[in-house]
């Protein structure tokens, strides 16, 4: 029996005067054949990396047990609603190379494919990072090879590029992070500056209505939900821009930029929302997002936690004080809350026969385990998602002491379809499924 269905290209976009809106994966895009078997195209695997600087308070991070039934530690308590979707990995190390700043090396080399003896002219064990190895493979079929995002509003250049970037094309070639949400939105959706005051949805509405007439009921619902999510992000950016304009009316000597008027939780969520939009529309399959830079005295203001800017790095060196350590634990807890919020959004997006999260590897981690001691052993690492079946989540995997984190990176690279057997100082692959 031949079924008559509308078939759409995965690259179908909505167009308007001055804007282009990519679409999420619809059922009409998945139909591989119109036979009675109704074979569908499998959604692609995506990889996202969520960086937290300056390590974590070790005593509050580590659970005492392993496996599927492990009990969450105080810091990890926010992942409770997504525990079955997250893999906790412990005892993964990087070898620290002497001669460079501990924080700069932690951030810049976190995802590095270099072994400890492969040093750049600047003295860092730094080569192409694993996100860029993945992007070389996946970027051939997406609009953007990769996205590099930062939630750092600070623009003081006292610190070098190594503190504020985790993605590198190779020695001396940084993939610089975007930190302006509005500029990122316009880049993703092709919004021209002279008409960016309106909604991108208004610009493509005629094309959207035309498409809607040809869709089935399920796809109509998906399209409506997606358009709503795009508008929600637009409104977030509009609110922050309005707040910036109000502040600038006070005639402060240095005008405030939109992202500098955000609390850090707002910043992380709006950048994370844009990353998720890029993933679900297949504009990219690889992205990195830094919650803050390494070491910088970046003003960190968190709604309901820190009403005045605090110095995260400075606090890590005061952990001997119980009051300071308590604040640090609250900050670690905050980062896990932000991660969980983004993961929940991915889990709520239907894709194929599952969800976007089922096809994700969303990794939270830091290149330094203890910010006060500057050590790289037992790095904090979480992975949300199932990577299209390559990962069996819901477990605490405790590796043998001295296991290089490169073993994890190698397994993740393979899950993205890149066939290599060695990466940096890897000694094998981690079994994640």
Predicted features and spans:
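Ligand-binding pockets and gating/stacking loops
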Residues: 1-433
């Amino acid at each position: 029996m031949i079924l008559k269905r509308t078939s759409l290209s995965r690259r179908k976009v909505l167009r308007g005067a001055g804007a282009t809106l990519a679409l999420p994966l619809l059922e009409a895009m998945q139909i591989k054949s119109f036979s009675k078997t109704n074979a569908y195209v499998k959604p692609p695997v995506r990889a996202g990396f969520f960086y937290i600087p300056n390590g974590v308070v070790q005593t509050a991070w580590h659970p005492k047990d392993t496996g599927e039934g492990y009990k969450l530690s105080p810091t990890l308590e926010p992942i409770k609603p997504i525990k079955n979707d997250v893999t906790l990995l412990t005892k993964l190390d990087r070898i620290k190379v002497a001669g460079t700043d501990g924080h700069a090396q932690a951030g810049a080399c976190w995802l590095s494919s270099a072994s400890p003896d492969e040093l750049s002219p600047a003295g860092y064990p730094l080569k192409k990072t694993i996100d860029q190895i993945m992007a070389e493979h996946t970027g051939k079929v997406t609009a953007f090879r990769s996205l590099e995002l930062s939630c750092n509003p600070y623009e003081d250049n006292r610190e070098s590029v190594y503190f504020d970037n985790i993605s590198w094309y190779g020695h001396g070639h940084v993939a610089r992070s975007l930190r302006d949400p509005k500029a990122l939105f316009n880049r993703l959706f092709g919004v021209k500056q002279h008409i960016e005051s309106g909604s991108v949805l208004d610009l493509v509405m005629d094309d959207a209505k035309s498409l809607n007439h040809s869709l089935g009921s399920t796809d109509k619902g998906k399209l409506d939900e997606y358009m709503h999510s795009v508008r929600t992000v637009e409104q977030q950016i509009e609110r922050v821009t309005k707040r910036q304009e109000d502040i600038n009316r006070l005639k402060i000597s240095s005008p405030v930029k939109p992202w500098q008027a955000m609390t850090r939780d707002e910043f992380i969520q709006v950048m994370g929302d844009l990353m998720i939009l890029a993933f679900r529309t297949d504009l990219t399959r690889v992205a990195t997002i830094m919650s803050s830079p390494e070491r910088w005295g970046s003003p960190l203001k968190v709604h309901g936690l820190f009403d005045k800017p605090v110095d995260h790095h400075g606090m890590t060196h005061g952990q001997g004080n119980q009051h300071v350590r308590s604040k640090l634990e609250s900050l670690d807890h905050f980062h896990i809350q932000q991660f969980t919020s983004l993961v929940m959004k991915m889990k709520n997006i239907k894709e194929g026969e599952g969800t976007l999260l089922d096809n994700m590897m969303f990794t939270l981690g830091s290149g330094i385990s203890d910010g006060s001691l500057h050590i790289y052993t037992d790095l904090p690492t979480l992975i949300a998602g199932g990577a299209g079946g390559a990962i069996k989540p819901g477990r605490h995997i405790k590796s043998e002491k001295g296991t290089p984190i490169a073993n994890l990176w190698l397994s993740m690279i393979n899950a993205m379809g890149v066939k290599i057997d060695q990466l940096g100082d890897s000694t094998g692959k981690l079994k994640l499924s």
